[in-house]
C-alpha cells in the first residue's frame, strides 16, 4: 500500500502536480537538496529537481521560499532564452486540445516545451490545465515537455509572480518554448500579457454580434486570433467569424510592435492549421527582433516585475 501511495505521489515524467496530500512527504522531498544541488540539477535539465525548486517558490514556509529565491538568483544568468507565448480563450474553446496539438508540433522541431498556467481560482483537486491531463497525455509523457499547473492559492498578483518565477526556472532548465495558459477571459489576460512575447487568442466559430463577450482590451492585446474547431460542419461559421474579427481588428490603432494582428482558423482536434499558426508566431518573432521591439519589451517586462516584487 505504501509503495502504491508513494508511486501515485511521484512526479510523472513531464507533468507535475503540486500535491498537498501528504505534507510530510513533500517537506522531506523539498528539503533534501542543498542550494548547489538544486542549481546543478536545474541547469542539467532535470525535471524532478525543477519541480522541487518550483515547490520551494510556491511554499507557504519562509525558509523554503527563501531557498527557492536563492535558487532562482543563481539560475538567473541562464534565463531569457525562450519564446514566451500566452494562450487564452473563452471556456469550451479547446485550449487543452490546442496546446496538445501545437505542443507536439513544436517538439517535432527539436524544441523543449514547458506549459504553465495562471488560474487564481484553481484548487488542488480541480487544477486548471491539469484538471484533465488526458487531454495532453502525449505532452505529459514526452521527455522534452514539462507541464505545471497554476499555483493554487493567493491573489492574482501572487499567483502571477510565482508563475513568472516558474517561467524563469524553466528557462534555466533549458526549455526554450514556454506556454502560459490562462483560464477564462478576464483580468488574468492582462497579467499574462505582461510576461509573454506573443499573445494568442483562441475563439469559437459563430462569433455573432457580441464577439463572444470578449472585452476590447483582450482583443487589442492579441497578436493573433485563431478560430478553433473550424471543422466540416462549422467551417462556414468559422469563415464568417474570421471576417467579423478582421473587421473589428481594423478599427484598432496600430501596434507598438509594428506587427499587424491577423485572424486565422484551425482545428486542433484534426491538426489542421496548427503549422500555419506556428509559422505566424515565427514571423512575428523575426519582425520584432529585427526592429528592436522584442528586446525593448523584454526590458519593460523585467522592470515591471521588479517593481511588482518590491511593492
Annotated model-derived regions:
Residues 1-43, 49:
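Long, basic/Gly/Ser/Thr-rich N-terminal segments
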Residues 224, 230-287:
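Canonical P-loop GTPase G-domain recognition
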Residues 50-52, 265, 276-311:
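Long, well-ordered amphipathic alpha-helical subdomains in the mid-to-C-terminal portions
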Residues 207-236:
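Flexible active-site lid/hinge loop adjacent to a nucleotide/diphosphate
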Residues 43-44, 57, 61-65, 92, ...:
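Conserved phosphate/pyrophosphate-binding and hydrolysis machinery centered on Walker-type P-loop NTPases
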Residues 89:
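The Walker A (P-loop) glycine that initiates the GxxxxGKT/S ATP-binding motif of P-loop NTPases
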Residues 129, 166, 191, 195, ...:
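Alpha-helical scaffold elements adjacent to nucleotide-binding pockets in ATP/GTP-utilizing enzyme cores
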Residues 34-85, 93, 99-188, 195-202, ...:
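Nucleotide-state-sensitive switch-loop elements of NTP-binding domains
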Amino acid at each position: 500500500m505504501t509503495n502504491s501511495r508513494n508511486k501515485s505521489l511521484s512526479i510523472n515524467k513531464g507533468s507535475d502536480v503540486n500535491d498537498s496530500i501528504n505534507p510530510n512527504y513533500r517537506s522531506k522531498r523539498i528539503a533534501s537538496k542543498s542550494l548547489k544541488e538544486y542549481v546543478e540539477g536545474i541547469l542539467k535539465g532535470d525535471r524532478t529537481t525543477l519541480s522541487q525548486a518550483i515547490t520551494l517558490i510556491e511554499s507557504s514556509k519562509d525558509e523554503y521560499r527563501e531557498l527557492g529565491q536563492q535558487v532562482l538568483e543563481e539560475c538567473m544568468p541562464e534565463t531569457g532564452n525562450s519564446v514566451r507565448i500566452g494562450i487564452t480563450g473563452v471556456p469550451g474553446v479547446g485550449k487543452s486540445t490546442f496546446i496538445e496539438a501545437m505542443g507536439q508540433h513544436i517538439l517535432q522541431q527539436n524544441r523543449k516545451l514547458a506549459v504553465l498556467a495562471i488560474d487564481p481560482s484553481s484548487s488542488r483537486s480541480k487544477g486548471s490545465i491539469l484538471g484533465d491531463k488526458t487531454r495532453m497525455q502525449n505532452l505529459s509523457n514526452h521527455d522534452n515537455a514539462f507541464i505545471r499547473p497554476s499555483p493554487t492559492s493567493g491573489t492574482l498578483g501572487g499567483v502571477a509572480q510565482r508563475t513568472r518565477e516558474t517561467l524563469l526556472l524553466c528557462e534555466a532548465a533549458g526549455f526554450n518554448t514556454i506556454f502560459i495558459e490562462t483560464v477564462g477571459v478576464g483580468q488574468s489576460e492582462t497579467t499574462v500579457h505582461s510576461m509573454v512575447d506573443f499573445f494568442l487568442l483562441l475563439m469559437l466559430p459563430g462569433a455573432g454580434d457580441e464577439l463572444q463577450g470578449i472585452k476590447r482590451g483582450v482583443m487589442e492585446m492579441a497578436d493573433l486570433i485563431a478560430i478553433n474547431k473550424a471543422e466540416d460542419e462549422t467551417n462556414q461559421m468559422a469563415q464568417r467569424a474570421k471576417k467579423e474579427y478582421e473587421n473589428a481588428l481594423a478599427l484598432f490603432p496600430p501596434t507598438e510592435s509594428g506587427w499587424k494582428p491577423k485572424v486565422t482558423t484551425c482545428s486542433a482536434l484534426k491538426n489542421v492549421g496548427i503549422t500555419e499558426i506556428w509559422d505566424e508566431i515565427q514571423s512575428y518573432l523575426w519582425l520584432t527582433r529585427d526592429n528592436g521591439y522584442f528586446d525593448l519589451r523584454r526590458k519593460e517586462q523585467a522592470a515591471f516585475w521588479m517593481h511588482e516584487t518590491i511593492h
